[in-house]
Amino acid sequence: MKKLLGIFFISLLLSVNAYADSVYNGTFIDAHSQVGKLITDETVSKIINKNDVDLTLLSIRGKWKTATQRYKSIQRLTQNKTRYLIPTKLRGFSRKKQSADRAIKGIEDLKKQAIKNNINYVGFGEIIVQHAPHNHKKLKYEGINNDLNSKRIVRAIDIVLKDNKPVILHVELNDYEEDSKKILGQLVKLGKKYPNDNFLLMHMAQIEFTEAEFIINETNNIHFITSHADNERAERMKKKPGRSQMGWINLFDKKNNFQKKWLDLMNQNPKRFVLALDNVWDRHWFNGYKERIYMWRKALASLNSDAASLIACGNAKSYFKLNIECLKDRK
């Protein structure tokens, strides 16, 4: 497996010179990544500082009592190259046995913690609605399958909307395919119930192309976060079945170019896609981060310039109300 991933990343590196003139050089925002206890503030800050991402929206994993302390440390060490997303899952929100009241109190406590520490947070991290079981040495997880009408989900969404922030939802339409039609219908109803708010689907919700067209046609405010919808994730899924999610989608062809149908959909509906890398584990920061950034910059260059700028920067700026200039070319 490591050998295959190594070949994947080497192929990306070797292609840098060949595509030097067709790499997107505009402002690049990673609209959702995470830092956990397996990587230090100093280490992740060094990685952020030396790579070509202009701004990272960051949520903290691990101990909830030190979440804001960790974020402030990283923000200082990166010289303000990060913005804070209040974590939603640190106190058992995505655990079946955790009561909804305690899970919601966890989010409220983390918001109070951020305010007390004078952190100008720009939003909240992903709300886990559905998540497949995880069988890995670093995480044993029984999975969870809520829907958008579940008590804790409704209350979490309400907290975010009352703060006038975009709602990031983690649903897995393929891993829970038996419920996909229900979830799609609930998403449409949610978008229409709150027409002036924005909802972002993490990892593009494992959505199939026809389902994405359906969401775009039926709503104006349900958008897609691009994280983990690529060849690297597809290879891991193929070689290590059964350890975690198996429903990942892939926007790319074998040469790391956008598949034409997705390319066309992005060009036609650029305000519906938000770029994010979603580094979760320490390995996401240590292994292949630079190559993933390059892969996305190369892919963005294949879009028309307005679409590329919106997906890479403009949409995140608008939805999260970020104070950043979205340049099409930083030269």
Task: Show which residues each predicted segment covers.
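Structural recognition of the beta-strand scaffold that forms the well-ordered cores
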Residues: 27-31, 54-60, 83-88, 122-126, ...
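Active-site gating/metal-coordination segments in enzymes
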Residues: 23, 69-175
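Mid-to-C-terminal alpha-helical segments outside catalytic/metal-binding sites
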Residues: 2, 20-29, 35, 39-55, ...
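Acidic (Asp/Glu)-rich catalytic clusters
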Residues: 45-52, 70-83, 109-120, 156-162, ...
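Catalytic pocket-lining loop regions of alpha/beta-barrel enzymes
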Residues: 139-274, 323, 327
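Acidic-and-aromatic substrate-binding clefts and catalytic sites of carbohydrate-active enzymes
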Residues: 32-41, 60-69, 93-105, 147, ...
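Bacterial N-terminal signal peptides
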Residues: 6-15
